[in-house]
């Protein structure tokens, strides 16, 4: 169904009529000029992410349902990175005429799945037209106790540096998808050239056979057996609210924290800069999944570089006082990778052979040409 057939109000009703509000802080959601929220005795956290087609995602290999899920999770992750609890979400979408109502239905299936996982209310947004493809802007609103919110600037000398999960898998998933995309378009271009030549020579039978091959190519699905984890990390990342809950249960308050969206190197430098400190990170301690290592070897890439600079992991990077060592070391899903130092000692990566290298930001830069 064309979106124009529904109109703005019909589309709003279709996407939001089945939304149920779950949070006491949501006093009024979709349906008026503004949502109404109430946060007595709490600090309010607000984060926004914009995702642009061709810059942040490629619809060649991510479907609308996964895109909706991922778009929500990258925002939810920011709230958890401040040690907060996500409560509400505002969703704005600009889309071109090539998109149908059913595409938005699928987007919202994924979006709602992410929100339902963490009991988040969708309370508003906007939908408009676009001449340049799909643009998504999502704002997530959360809450936290004043003395529990964690910033980037609290790391202190001797603090332990920790990360959750494993790193580099999302980047390797992206490399895998990009490789298959290049193969697909290469084969398609070759067939298109052959069809053009066949038409020029008047060989209708060859044109028919080549067109059949094009149709078969369009229906072809790459074999990703053994690489499912990499695809899941790229297409459907998970915000680490589970780690926030584990830290609270263990009585651990991080001194600094952020999520790993642009790469471990970049995020370490952010924390060190804002906390006025240095760090020593040990290569052998960086958690890397087996599939990530295998894929890096297959593509002749340095797996540590992928883990340090790949980005889109949406794991948590945080520091804790050294006195919490015994509490943190046994928490499942958390790995100690180094410690905080004096600023004059710099930001160093200690390689497996003992050599030290300066950590540089080589991760994702959305404004890089």
What are the functions of these language-model segments?
Residues 1-369:
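Helix-biased detector of long, well-ordered alpha-helical tracts
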């Amino acid at each position: 169904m064309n979106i124009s057939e529904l109109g703005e109000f019909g589309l709003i009703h279709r996407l939001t009529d089945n939304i149920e509000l779950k949070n006491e802080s949501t006093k009024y959601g979709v349906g008026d000029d503004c949502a109404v929220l109430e946060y007595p005795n709490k600090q309010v956290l607000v984060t926004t992410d914009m995702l642009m087609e061709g810059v942040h995602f490629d619809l060649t290999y991510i479907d609308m349902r996964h895109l909706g899920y991922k778009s929500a999770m990258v925002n939810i992750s920011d709230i958890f990175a401040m040690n907060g609890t996500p409560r509400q979400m505002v969703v704005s979408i600009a889309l071109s005429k090539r998109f149908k109502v059913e595409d938005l239905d699928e987007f919202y299936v994924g979006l709602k799945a992410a929100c339902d996982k963490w009991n988040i209310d969708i309370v508003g947004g906007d939908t408009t037209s676009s001449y340049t493809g799909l643009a998504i802007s999502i704002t997530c609103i959360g809450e936290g106790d004043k003395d529990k919110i964690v910033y980037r600037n609290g790391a202190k000398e001797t603090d332990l540096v920790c990360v959750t999960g494993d790193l580099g898998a999302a980047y390797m998933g992206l490399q895998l998808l990009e490789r298959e995309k290049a193969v697909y378009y290469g084969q398609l271009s070759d067939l298109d050239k052959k069809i053009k030549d066949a038409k020029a020579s008047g060989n209708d039978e060859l044109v028919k056979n080549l067109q059949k091959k094009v149709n078969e190519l369009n229906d072809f699905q790459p074999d990703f057996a053994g690489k499912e984890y990499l695809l899941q990390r790229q297409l459907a990342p998970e915000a680490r609210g589970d780690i926030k809950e584990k830290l609270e249960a263990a009585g651990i308050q991080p001194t600094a924290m952020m999520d790993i969206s642009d790469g471990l190197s970049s995020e370490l430098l952010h924390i060190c800069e804002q906390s006025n400190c240095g760090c020593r990170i040990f290569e052998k301690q960086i958690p890397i999944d087996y599939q990530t290592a295998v894929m890096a070897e297959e593509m002749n890439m340095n797996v540590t570089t992928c883990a340090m600079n790949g980005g889109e992991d949406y794991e948590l990077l945080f520091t804790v006082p050294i006195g919490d060592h015994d509490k943190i070391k046994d928490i499942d899903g958390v790995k100690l990778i180094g410690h905080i130092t004096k600023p004059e000692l710099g930001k160093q990566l200690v390689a497996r052979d003992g050599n030290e290298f300066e950590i540089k930001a080589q991760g994702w830069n959305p404004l890089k040409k």
